[in-house]
Regions:
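C-terminal, active-site-flanking charged/polar segments
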Residues: 1, 43-46, 64-67, 185-217, ...
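Contiguous transmembrane helix-bundle modules in multi-pass membrane proteins
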Residues: 1-87, 309-314, 321-324, 345, ...
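Loop/turn elements at helix/coil->beta-strand transitions in domains of secreted/extracellular proteins
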Residues: 7-9, 99-103, 169-172
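Extracytoplasmic/lumenal acceptor-recognition loop(s) of multi-pass membrane glycoenzymes
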Residues: 62-81, 94-165, 201-228, 233, ...
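Short, polar loop motifs at secondary-structure junctions
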Residues: 110, 175-181, 408-411
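Periplasmic/luminal catalytic loop of GT-C fold multi-pass membrane glycosyltransferases
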Residues: 148-191, 199
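Catalytic cores of secreted or luminal carbohydrate-active enzymes
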Residues: 165-170, 191-261, 356-372
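Active-site-proximal, structured, solvent-exposed surfaces of multi-pass membrane proteins
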Residues: 253-477
Length: 477
């Protein structure tokens, strides 16, 4: 079209100006690249239209630019490192003989493929990066359990060293190097990679008679909400009982800060980090030493993408708030941490470059001994068989209670107890559950996509219409 001079340059210019205004208003961090591309493209179009002598020259230049861009863009692609392949092989060897149906968290390499189960069908993960994952589960993780938000958007759910979350979500196994988390013991090691196990965690499915009313639960704040979740089933019809917490609050003094990086400046509640990974080292208050430490505060300001994201890491547990112009702004204004290291005496706090307005700083602690017996007050469910979208289980519970799963609730689930369909409901703010009378029961949990049949019918109709339309076009020819 350009070579034949059939392009309307005035119309193209008008539309381009409108597009430029939209880009300018949008204030994307990539706007400058668009402006450069726009200017170069218009120069090339002008010479191709009005300077015939330069047609071949600019065609060559255009091809060179495209080739150069392609090479630079593809240069960013990286092959899988041999060390990653070695890690994966070590992990496969470590987990191949595990015969329990439990969850596993890979803490060795956060970039590991979260959907890879390494050949062991008994192991599951509750970490995913997907726009199609359960919105109910996503909301539970970040808004109910107040788990650390480690990434630039909420769609990424990656492993954490949060002992409360690990125990609640049935993470019996961890894989990594030098893991020092309460409750986990090394049971095998290959090379530099170790397999750790914690038998104190809640099972994949269980029955509990300890219930807590959802309205009362919604009034709780971090970290008390996590403690109640570990010890109760949250339901609409739960008990209105008073919960006796084991969590205690402690206070941080300025004298507890033992080291301040030269790139950090502190003024009242504002911390200025002049350089990436600037750090503080803070002594843990004496009452909280060796305990599970909870930290929470509000980050009341934001900053431009010209500076970058805001992030604070405490002993490797990171919370991130995206810069203001980022298209997937995560809105993380409340930073919470669960520091689960054994022998905890001090914490290292690291900052990305930026200005941090920190308000309402609170510290709490709890002993691991106060939560390690959570699975003593429930009845574990036997998972007899998994066949496609069907889970067959059995349980003998000594009193009436709730059958609790760690499966995100969905309308597609059907539950049969001793062959009879029962009503399901949302428990623990996200999971599939239902009431279960005391006694010995055989239970089948089935899943069928709610709109699967409609989707199949519409697909068939679409194929028929496509064939019919092409047949008519063929006849006309």
């Amino acid at each position: 079209t350009i070579f034949n001079k059939k392009i309307d340059i005035k119309k193209l210019f008008r539309y381009s100006v409108i597009l430029l205004l939209i880009v300018f208003i949008g204030k994307s961090s990539y706007s400058n690249y668009f402006y450069i591309d726009y200017i170069i493209s218009f120069i090339i179009i002008y010479f191709l239209l009005y300077k015939n002598n330069y047609k071949k020259t600019f065609t060559v230049i255009y091809l060179i630019l495209l080739t150069t861009y392609s090479v630079i863009a593809n240069k960013e692609d990286k092959l899988v490192k041999s060390s990653v392949i070695k890690d994966n092989n070590e992990i496969k060897e470590l987990v191949k003989d595990i015969d329990t149906i439990d969850r596993i968290a890979f803490l060795k390499n956060y970039s590991i493929n979260v959907n890879n189960i390494f050949g062991n069908i008994n192991l599951y993960q509750n970490y995913v990066y997907s726009s199609t994952s359960s919105s109910l589960y996503n909301k539970f993780v970040f808004d109910v359990f107040d788990r650390e938000m480690q990434h630039r958007n909420r769609l990424i759910l990656s492993p954490v060293k949060n002992i409360m979350f690990l125990m609640f979500m049935n993470n019996r196994y961890l894989v990594g190097e030098n893991i020092n988390i309460h409750g986990y013991k090394e049971i095998n090691k290959i090379g530099n990679t170790s397999l750790y196990e914690n038998t104190d965690i809640l099972p994949f499915m269980y029955v509990s008679s300890n219930t807590y009313n959802i309205n009362n639960y919604n009034k709780l704040s971090f970290p008390y909400n996590d403690e109640v979740l570990l010890n109760n089933v949250i339901t609409n019809n739960g008990d209105n009982k008073h919960y006796n917490t084991k969590i205690k609050e402690v206070f941080l003094r300025r004298s507890d800060i033992k080291y301040i990086d030269t790139n950090i400046k502190i003024e009242n509640n504002v911390i200025y980090s002049m350089k990436r990974n600037s750090k503080l080292i803070i002594d843990v208050p004496s009452d909280a030493k060796g305990k599970i430490l909870f930290v929470s505060f509000n980050l009341s300001n934001g900053q431009s993408c010209s500076i970058g994201d805001m992030a604070i890491s405490i002993n490797g547990n990171i919370n991130k708030k995206t810069c203001n112009e980022w298209k997937y702004y995560n809105g993380n204004d409340s930073f919470t941490y669960v520091i689960s290291d054994k022998d905890l005496n001090s914490v290292t706090v690291e900052f990305l470059k930026g200005e941090y307005h920190i308000d309402n700083l609170r510290l709490y602690y709890i002993s691991y001994d106060d939560i390690k017996d959570i699975n003593k007050n429930i009845t574990k469910v036997n998972i007899d068989k998994i066949d496609g979208d069907n889970i067959y289980t059995s349980v003998n519970n000594i009193e009436d209670g709730y059958f609790v799963t760690s499966l995100p609730y969905d309308k597609g689930y059907t539950v049969l107890v001793d062959g009879k369909k029962v009503e399901t409901e949302i428990v623990n703010k996200y999971a599939l559950g239902f009431k279960l009378d005391k006694g010995n029961h055989n239970i089948k949990i089935s899943y069928k996509s709610p709109f699967k049949n409609i989707g199949i019918i519409l697909s068939i109709v679409g194929i028929v219409l496509f064939v019919f339309n092409n047949y008519n076009l063929f006849k006309k020819k």
